[in-house]
């Protein structure tokens, strides 16, 4: 396992971690000032400043990307299916413009939540099928653009509204069906917040292999958790076995950035420099 204690050269900041404290340009400037070498921006943050400005800011700051958030939200009724397809193609194009190593896919849940305005449904198996069909269609476009797709399994509490792929095993099943020969361009983004509880996690990581492990995200699970979405913990403040999981991921040969992604009303209320400084300290000591 890599030694992270000496510096934070392998730290990436998902820009949602400080989204309330400043726009993307301010976040990029702060990361460069703190010696953070990589970011993973969100599409809405890029749109707010403009894609060209975002591309230039990343380049001028000498930063790399560890991913781009996000594509997905595939389930939709017939009236919204083209919207989903076109939106995901735009996400691929944006990721390519930013030189992202992968586009992270939050696949969506039931159609009325994935694509608002879609007819209400309770048919979860149909949503699963739409997700797989949507990834299959997007994969062809993404491969032509040279942009790998990283399926991110989300915690089961998000199955209805955010992602109906809820285990690493399910994500890998999709990868194996759509890319049986492991030609590349399709894998997973593993976020410890979503998968730490899974008794099959270690087996899933081994099954993943280096070629399918496209991104690795860290934060912590607080007890109690006060909000289903906006109460992630800073690394070391919760109950996730962060070093154990990272050791298993890195045993595959994973050598890319460790990305900090924290949605937290608590941490959003603090100054950006304090949050980034804490991320750096915890990256060195507990991740």
Show where each model-derived region lies.
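Active-site acidic/histidine proton-transfer and metal-coordination neighborhood
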Residues: 3-4, 60, 80-187, 197, ...
């Amino acid at each position: 396992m890599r030694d992270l204690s000496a510096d934070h050269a392998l730290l990436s900041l998902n820009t949602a971690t400080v989204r309330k404290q400043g726009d993307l340009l301010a976040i990029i400037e702060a990361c460069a000032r703190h010696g953070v070498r990589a970011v993973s921006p969100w599409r809405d943050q890029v749109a707010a400043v403009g894609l060209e400005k975002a591309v230039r800011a990343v380049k001028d700051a000498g930063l790399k990307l560890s991913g781009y958030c996000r594509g997905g939200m595939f389930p939709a009724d017939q009236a919204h299916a083209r919207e989903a397809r076109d939106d995901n193609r735009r996400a691929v194009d944006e990721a390519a413009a930013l030189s992202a190593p992968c586009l992270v896919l939050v696949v969506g849940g039931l159609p009325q939540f994935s694509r608002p305005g879609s007819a209400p449904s309770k048919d979860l198996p149909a949503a699963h099928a739409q997700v797989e069909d949507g990834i299959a269609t997007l994969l062809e476009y993404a491969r032509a653009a040279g942009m790998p797709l990283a399926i991110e399994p989300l915690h089961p509490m998000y199955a209805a509204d955010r992602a109906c792929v809820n285990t690493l095993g399910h994500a890998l099943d999709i990868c194996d069906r759509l890319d049986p020969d492991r030609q590349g361009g399709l894998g997973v983004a593993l976020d410890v917040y979503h998968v730490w509880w899974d008794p099959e996690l270690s087996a899933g990581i081994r099954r993943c292999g280096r070629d399918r492990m496209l991104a690795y995200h860290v934060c912590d699970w607080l007890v109690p958790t006060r909000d289903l979405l906006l109460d992630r913990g800073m690394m070391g403040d919760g109950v996730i076995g962060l070093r154990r999981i990272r050791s298993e991921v890195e045993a595959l040969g994973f050598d890319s950035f460790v990305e900090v992604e924290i949605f937290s009303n608590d941490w959003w209320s603090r100054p950006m420099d304090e949050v980034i400084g804490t991320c750096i300290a915890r990256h060195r000591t507990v991740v």
